[in-house]
Regions:
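Structural signal for alpha-helical transmembrane segments and their membrane-water exit/capping regions
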Residues: 2-3, 7-38, 50-65, 184-189, ...
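Interfacial loop-to-helix junctions that mark the boundaries of transmembrane helices
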Residues: 8-15, 37-47, 159-171, 198-204, ...
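Transmembrane helical segments that form the transport core of multi-pass membrane transport proteins
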Residues: 42, 64, 68-71, 212-309
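Membrane-interfacial loop-to-helix junctions in multi-pass transporters
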Residues: 44-47, 76-89, 118-128, 203-208, ...
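Flexible interhelical linker loops that connect adjacent transmembrane helices
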Residues: 72, 185-210, 242-246
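Hydrophobic transmembrane alpha-helices that form the pore/transport pathway of multi-pass ion
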Residues: 90-138, 152, 302-315, 344-346, ...
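Membrane-core helix-loop-helix motifs of multi-pass transport proteins
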Residues: 120-188, 193-198, 337-365
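C-terminal transmembrane helix pair
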Residues: 165-176, 286-372
Length: 372
């Protein structure tokens, strides 16, 4: 029994590695900055509430196959693998703008797996997953709720909606062009056949969940006080779909909590404050991109925001920096986990291909933003 529990604990830690790294980092910094009343100022309750509300409603929509059916219908319009891959990538791209990058991947990676395996096109799986991953990370850059770091910076600096999109539009357009070119160049227009399996969604619950989704988005855009969503959305889902509340990615929320503690403490260590302030003064954009490659984009956004008011370059840096290493984005770990789960023994080749495409995208986008 003990060994069984130990196995379950190890499996849980492996599944939530980033959360445990964040927890350890937070605990270590507590030795340098002992807990006090200032800790309460570390936590951005509104950001955590927005994340929870969006994740909960997305889980409810996922449970009625809303995204799956929507995506599958779009894919079935196309008759060759190149167009199908483009459709999968664009669905993930658009989905990340609406439901955040990690949830877009959790929703549409299984669809990509289904399309490729059911049509005998498994050879394109690594490429498709990598493009979906890049699309999720870069597609989410355009909107405040497209990824967690955007939501955090948007809330912290109170960035106006129009200004936010003006900052992110140029690299967003370049990303669209690059992703499209890659899919055209690396995927042949081979014929594609897929069985049409009818699927329906309950109309009443669909309307209800879409209304809740609209409420969640209104909270993100500051149209409604966050506490209203924190009361209404869980209350409705308790009766409509209790399972959705259990499915919420709570480790992601805890990761944020731990990184709030970590970044808050780091900001109070004099040596760290002086070093980061110096580096960010030299180039906020470049340092934030590099930081993402080491500690991921979400913690980079949380940590570096303590040392600079240059939210424009920080916003660009933590979005562009989301592509690069496997740990540059929490979403990339989702893709890696999903791919290796179905392709054991191909980890090395996947990491090589992943690194080649991601670093190419990062360098091109960083150069574009710095030059133009």
């Amino acid at each position: 029994m003990d060994s069984l529990h130990l196995h379950e604990i190890v499996a849980f830690i492996k599944k939530n590695t980033v959360m445990f790294i964040a927890m350890v980092a937070a605990i270590v910094t507590c030795f340098f900055v002992p807990p006090d009343s200032l800790y309460l100022d570390y936590f951005d309750v509104k950001t955590l509430t927005c994340l929870f509300c969006v994740l909960a409603v997305v889980c409810a929509l996922k449970n009625i196959n809303f995204f799956y059916m929507l995506a599958r219908k779009i894919v079935q319009v196309f008759r060759n693998i190149r167009m199908a891959v483009l459709a999968l990538v664009y669905i993930t791209f658009i989905g990340s703008m609406l439901i955040a990058n990690d949830m877009a991947l959790l929703t549409f990676l299984p669809l990509g797996l289904f399309v490729l395996t059911s049509t005998g096109k498994g050879k394109y799986m690594a490429f498709t997953f990598i493009m979906q991953n890049i699309a999720a990370n870069l597609g989410g850059m355009l909107t405040p709720f497209g990824n967690p770091q955007n939501l955090y910076l948007y809330t912290k600096f109170q960035i106006p909606n129009l200004e936010f999109m003006q900052i992110m539009a140029p690299p967003f357009v370049v990303a669209v062009v690059l992703i499209t070119l890659c899919c055209i160049i690396f995927v042949k227009p081979e014929p594609l056949e897929m069985k049409d399996e009818p699927m329906t969604v309950p109309t009443g619950r669909t309307v209800l969940y879409l209304l809740l989704f609209a409420l969640a988005i209104a909270i993100v855009f500051r149209g409604i006080p966050y506490w209203i969503g924190l009361i209404v959305i869980p209350a409705v889902l308790i009766f409509a779909d209790r399972k959705a509340l259990k499915m919420v990615d709570y480790p992601l929320l805890l990761t944020f909590v731990f990184f709030f503690v970590f970044s808050g403490n780091m900001a109070r260590i004099d040596g760290v404050r002086r070093l980061f302030s110096f580096l960010l003064e030299k180039s906020t954009l470049l340092f934030s991109v590099i930081s993402c490659q080491v500690i991921s984009n979400v913690p980079s956004a949380i940590l570096l925001s303590q040392f600079t008011e240059n939210y424009r370059e920080l916003l660009l840096g933590v979005n562009i920096g989301g592509v690069g290493t496997l740990i540059a984005s929490l979403a990339s770990l989702i893709t890696f986990r999903e791919y290796t789960k179905h392709n054991t023994g191909k980890t090395g080749s996947y990491i090589l291909l992943f690194s080649a495409f991601n670093f190419a995208f990062m360098l091109i986008l960083a150069a574009f933003v710095m030059l133009f």
